[in-house]
Amino acid sequence: MRVADFSFELPESLIAHYPQPERSGCRLLSLDGPTGALTHGTFTDLLDKLNPGDLLVFNNTRVIPARLFGRKASGGKIEVLVERMLDDKRILAHIRASKAPKPGAELLLGDDESINATMVARHDALFEVEFNDARPVLDILNAIGHMPLPPYIDRPDEDADRELYQTVYSQKPGAVAAPTAGLHFDEPLLERLREKGIEMAFVTLHVGAGTFQPVRVDTIEDHIMHSEYAEVPQDVVDAVLAAKARGNRVIAVGTTSVRSLESAAQAAKKDLIEPFFGDTKIFIYPGYQYTVIDALVTNFHLPESTLIMLVSAFAGYQNTMNAYKAAVEQNYRFFSYGDAMFITYNPQALNERVGE
């Protein structure tokens, strides 16, 4: 399967650099999986598309201020992007510098270079960094870090991004990118969903910077997926099994919720899905057999990204590419701060030939 089959033309003007003034005020493109039919509306139309007893599964990760600026004590400027927090003293990070720091190198971090750290070891493309500070890592990041806006939002982060680039229900710090489908849910909408009898459950997947890495191979099967930490606790498993038992749908809010639920299903020994705590490298592309989710809320993704492949495996390749073509023609806003889709499962997607 060719990566190029997932390419599409996207005018620069359709990339959203700021969110809508109101979270739930974005547009919603609905794709009916079995028929490919498209419906245009606004995000609050979701209320009419869900039935009492349906289960929404959210990702409650919280974005950390993961981008740090500073310099090596020996001189050169550096930019650090945290991939994950290892413990209260250490991080695993990407480091941009004219010359990569060697183990033992001292780093001066923060806009005022007030934080001292040491590059301890290199792990392939990532650097293990230890802070020489009494405070825990998270406190240091909150003090000196910048919000890690995606590379396609071509502007410096602003104070407002600390809340805007965060879901209203975020709880567990650890992500370096927001689970963006969740950004559209505000408290009034969540309340109306609860009043309608919509069930809610929360997984955790700490989105890594790898989510922005381009696919650098020509053939999809050759791509090596990045690893991210996910948690699917017992209460989520119970909620999923209960929804299935009563004939309701499981609706994933975002591709990270999809990857969490499907990872837990793949690892399950007896039931459809069992609790899961650990790293996942699940790579979902056409031909993948979905086992848990019946519908999906998601944003519009980058051309040739692993996420448009995940959507194609769910909705069908042709349906997905047609929907994206329509979205471009209708001037939908793309990527993290952009508009959303609501997609129901297409059982024919499994047998569809891609690129034909």
Swiss-Prot record:
E.C. designation(s): 2.4.99.17
Describe the subunit structure: Monomer.
What Pfam family is a match for this entry?
A: Queuosine_synth
Say which enzyme class the record assigns. Answer: transferase
Under which pathway is this protein filed?
Answer: tRNA modification; tRNA-queuosine biosynthesis
Q: Which GO terms describe its biological process?
A: queuosine biosynthetic process; tRNA wobble guanine modification
Q: Report the subcellular localization.
A: Cytoplasm
Q: Which GO terms describe its molecular function?
A: S-adenosylmethionine:tRNA ribosyltransferase-isomerase activity
NCBIfam families cross-referenced by the UniProt entry = PRK00147.1, queA
Q: What is its main location?
A: cytoplasm
Report the catalytic activity: 7-aminomethyl-7-carbaguanosine(34) in tRNA + S-adenosyl-L-methionine = epoxyqueuosine(34) in tRNA + adenine + L-methionine + 2 H(+)
Q: Which InterPro entries match?
A: QueA, QueA_dom1, QueA_dom2, QueA_sf
Give the protein's recorded name: S-adenosylmethionine:tRNA ribosyltransferase-isomerase
Q: What does this protein do?
A: Transfers and isomerizes the ribose moiety from AdoMet to the 7-aminomethyl group of 7-deazaguanine (preQ1-tRNA) to give epoxyqueuosine (oQ-tRNA).
Protein species of origin: Enterobacter sp. (strain 638)
- Does the keyword S-adenosyl-L-methionine feature in the UniProt annotation? yes
Top-level taxon of the source organism:
Bacteria
| Family as reported in the entry's similarity comment | Belongs to the QueA family.
Q: Which GO terms describe its cellular component?
A: cytoplasm
The protein's gene is named queA
Q: Keywords on this record?
A: Cytoplasm, Queuosine biosynthesis, S-adenosyl-L-methionine, Transferase
